Amino acid sequence: MMKKLSILCLTVLLTAITANAQMRKVTNMDAGWRFHLGNVENSEKTSFNDAGWRLLNVPHDWSIEGENLRDNPGGGSIGFFPTGLGWYRKMFDVKSFDSRKRYSIEFDGIYMNSTVWLNGHELGTWPYGYSSFSYDLTPYLKQKGNVLAVRVDNSQQTNSRWYSGSGIYRHVRLVETAATHFAKWGVFNSTLTLNDNEAVVRVKSDVENEEVGNRRLTLRHEVVDAMGVCVAKTEKVVSLKASETTADEQTLAVTHPHVWNLEHPYLYTLRSTLLDGKRIVDVVENTLGIRTIEYPLDKGFLLNGKQVKMKGVNLHHDGGAVGAAVPERVWERRLEILKSGGCNAIRTAHNPPAPEFLDLCDRMGFLVMDEAFDQWINGKNKQDYHLYYREWHERDLSAMVKRDRNHPSVVMWSIGNEIRDQRSEEGPGAAAEMIAICHRLDDTRLVTSGNDEIASNSPTSPEFLAAFENDIIGYNYPDRWRTRREVLYAIDKTNYPNRRVVATESTGLGGPRRQYQWPGTMPPPQLGAGADGFSPQQQLPPRFRRRNRGLISSEMIDVEHRWRFTTAYDYVIGDFMWTGIDYYGESGWPSRGSQSGYLDNCGFKKDSYWFFKSIWSDEPVLHLLPHWNWEGHEGQIMQVACFTNCTDVELFVNGKSYGKKSTEFPRRGVNPSWASYDPGKHFATTADLHLTWDVEYQPGEIKVVAVRDSVTVEEVIRTAGAPAQMRATVDRPSFRAVPSDVAHVTIEVLDKDGNLCPLADNLVRFNVKGGRLLGVENGNMTDLGSVLASERKAWSGKCMAIVAADKPGPVTVTAEADGIQTASITFTATIDKPQRTPKKTK
């Protein structure tokens, strides 16, 4: 039967394509734009001469190209990057132009206050910089000599609390359809029922008939598997009234379905077709992940009927050295590293992400809290979204929900973050209205927001929280509310047993990567809140300094306790820590950004990455810190720490044992009934989720040896000598010569024996042959050198270059530094699917 269905689907498709005359056509419009930074009168006019403007491709972010200056209007909120006003112009022809068709231009995101013209005619303005939107070009389009002009105004500062970027920083498309066509984002799929034998998929669709007369067309939906085989099909004849949008609903049964889950995120394609007889009128394809989501009051979150704890991180949208115009591979690599650390959930703080980000989450198996706004009626900055909320929030929220509702990775909507209207008279009504919008457009997901004042001295109003009582209450920093540090959500769950609970934002363990201060009894910054001993940060205002308060710091205690609580109580949906990755903005001079992530903005792992992996992952974890280069402190006592999920960890310093230690998890008494677990056979020396030893510092070697599932594992750190050489590695041996793909080349400064030099800050100069250098970074937010330069200092012994290619062939990256051996690596740019195995220099 399946073979017959597949042949039938293929036969019908081929027949229809043969008879087709009006199929949808989507053209990428990223290439060949002219750009000018600054305002020029009459730039929207067709006759304007833009020959002197810069030629570039979008996505493009002009802020990342500028200099970080203390007096830049956006200030520390956006990392002291420049903003301003810019113009883009593009000339294009439409060879297949047909006056009977409909044409639109789609922008995935322009930051911000963009106005668009076609051939001198103003199409409209869109203030919000994170929305995807489109304009109808049909009335003004011609076959040849079209001019598209876009004015982008990011000059009104401050309008963001984090780095926004400036410009057409996401993709652009030209869409050509027949006059009768599927509405934009007009097909919505969801899984109604699911078992091993069958999944029932519901498809809702909106069809626009812009003809002058009524029409009767066949509306067909097909489910196509990953091999291209049609596995389910349904169709019916629909009557379409002239100049109206018609809604339709159908269901399909998929037998023996492959489910979408975190381990095997299987994706089907839903192909939706409008036919006039055998002639295709329109076709759209959408991702289909067959999965069910539930939020039972006592079990938190169920994916396909199985309980899953959300091990989440908050992420801002910049991509480090590439700014806001992020090639897809940059996010793919970052998500690969997060996934390897046990992370399974992302909160898109605090705006809708790029569409391709969600495509990656679909393919890689992440759960996403898709967030809309950082402000509503009352603002946080003079020029932020509160100026536009009343007029624009319904359009912006609807755009997010309709655009993203076919992504199986998206499992809940968030309508706000730390909204000032938590206590205002208008807040409850605004929340209720937006929740209703979400439910009207998507009846499969619940809604939350990040509330940071639930138990504060000026608490969130009961009426505001009541708006979410049938959905999910999001808690920002629940561990900071004094008496609630221990009980967290328990008081509210007792008082409101029907409340669903998620930690939308909570304390993380950030700090500068591998930067420590002496004395050794003070911990590495990632264990506490950072280190005043990191000398550049001593220049920061007190608000932005990262203070080091001891290994058993409040941050470490909070994180460990919060995770125990989260795992012990089934009703807690999960925890989203702040943040997964360092980001530009929200900083004080001379810092460009926040170092709150457990990855820096190169994607390099901090110590805290290994802490979270030790509690989130089932893979053996054994991580030792700090580094072992403490010249001048020989014979003094310092602290050594270990993050692990192994048992019986033993520390050796230059061969001398400092004894075995073990963690105990969960701690006795954190379960709903006291000690309702088997504590295991080993003797726990601590109830914390990390281990420490006080040792005498002597140069040489520190080593930890541990046992995991009867397998012995170890980690060694050695005292490094003077920098003598460099090692170059690339994330993959090959990558595609397309704009969405890049290669990440990591440079490590080593001593003569190959040990990483943890204090090295050599200036590294890059030369690229066969490709283009897109950007350089090192993770040091106080390094104010341009990320578009061809050189970068190493920081904690490492730096990175991001490389692109315009054509297939070998790409060679050479790194040079004064006084040490040069490193070089060659890899391949190809038009084929890239290899996944990392490549290193010998």
Predicted regions and their residues:
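Accessory beta-strand-rich segments of carbohydrate-active enzymes
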Residues: M29, L37-N39, I78, T83-W185, ...
